[in-house]
């Protein structure tokens, strides 16, 4: 018995599509694989478990400001090295590395914009630049932003997201910025100018202990770490086990430290409502 030879259709392979490993990553919380582009389009929130990723200062401003309304102020200011600090690396070398890595000149971006059609002044901290630590330029730009607000009588919006506290490279000059920013923020209350403070993960150290908690209205994203010293440091000091949600947004809300817990996607709308009620 003879068998016919099967005929096979030859399919020419198409050009290979290269999928870069950098385009995918695992969620820190649920371990699901996420496509970076989709994750960024979702405002860096995991679609599976809702874990919030950290955003840069410019990403924050782009999310909040009306399209093409943001104008940066004092963007050319950079830190000096008053102490000629030398550690593993010199301060000047560290600053140069951070500028190249983040595309920012400092850990804060300040400027004016419109949010829901209302003119505002915004100051956003970038945790990617030396952990969002507060040095002389951060304090000076924040102070100038508040003084500009007092002149224009616009609402002031600060977005805090820095866990680095005072910047050790600048010593006492850095510590002084806590008093400086807190003092100038007090002038907003005296002038009756609206100050909305937005707390994001992480809002810690000198930023939490100065201007971040001085807003007339304080909003925070869900699950953000907010406090002065970290929970492990506190546990070691008081020798007691802290609640699992200690220093998280929800814990602070329950204890009256925060006015509104706002999802990231709803943050602009919530701020717009506040501005329309209390400013316009």
Where are these regions (language model features)?
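Intrinsically disordered, low-complexity segments enriched in small/flexible residues
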Residues: 1-104, 112-115, 274-280
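A generic structural signal for short coil/turn motifs at secondary-structure boundaries
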Residues: 36, 131-134, 166-170
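Structural motif
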Residues: 37, 159, 198-199
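Glycine-rich anion/phosphate-binding loops
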Residues: 101-107, 132-147
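Short glycine-rich loop/turn motifs
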Residues: 106-110, 119, 154-155, 193
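A structural preference for short, pocket-lining loop segments at secondary-structure junctions
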Residues: 115-124, 141-166
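STAS-typified acidic loop motif
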Residues: 118, 124-136
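Conserved catalytic cores of soluble enzyme domains
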Residues: 163-279
């Amino acid at each position: 018995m003879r068998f016919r030879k099967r005929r096979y259709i030859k399919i020419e392979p198409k050009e290979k599509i290269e999928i870069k490993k950098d385009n995918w990553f695992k969620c820190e919380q649920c371990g699901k694989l996420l496509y970076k582009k989709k994750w960024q389009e979702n405002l860096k929130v995991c679609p599976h478990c809702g874990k919030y990723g950290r955003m840069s200062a410019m990403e924050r401003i782009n999310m909040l400001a009306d399209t093409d309304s943001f104008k940066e102020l004092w963007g050319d200011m950079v830190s000096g090295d008053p102490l000629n600090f030398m550690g593993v690396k010199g301060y000047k070398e560290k600053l140069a590395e951070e500028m190249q890595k983040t595309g920012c000149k400092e850990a804060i971006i300040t400027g004016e914009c419109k949010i829901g059609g209302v003119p505002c002044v915004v100051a956003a901290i970038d945790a990617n630049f030396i952990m969002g630590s507060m040095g002389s330029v951060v304090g000076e730009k924040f102070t100038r932003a508040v003084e500009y607000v007092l002149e224009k009588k616009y609402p002031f919006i600060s977005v805090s997201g820095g866990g680095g506290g005072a910047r050790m490279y600048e010593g006492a000059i850095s510590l002084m910025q806590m008093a400086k920013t807190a003092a100038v923020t007090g002038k907003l209350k005296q002038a009756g100018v609206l100050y909305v403070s937005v707390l994001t993960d992480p809002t810690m150290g000198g930023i939490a202990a100065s201007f971040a908690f001085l807003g007339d209205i304080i909003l925070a994203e869900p699950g953000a770490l907010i406090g002065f010293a970290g929970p492990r440091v506190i546990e070691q000091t008081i020798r007691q086990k802290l609640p699992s949600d200690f220093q998280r947004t929800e814990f602070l809300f329950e204890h009256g430290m925060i006015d509104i817990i706002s999802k990231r996607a709803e943050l602009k709308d919530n701020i717009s409502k506040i501005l329309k009620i209390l400013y316009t």
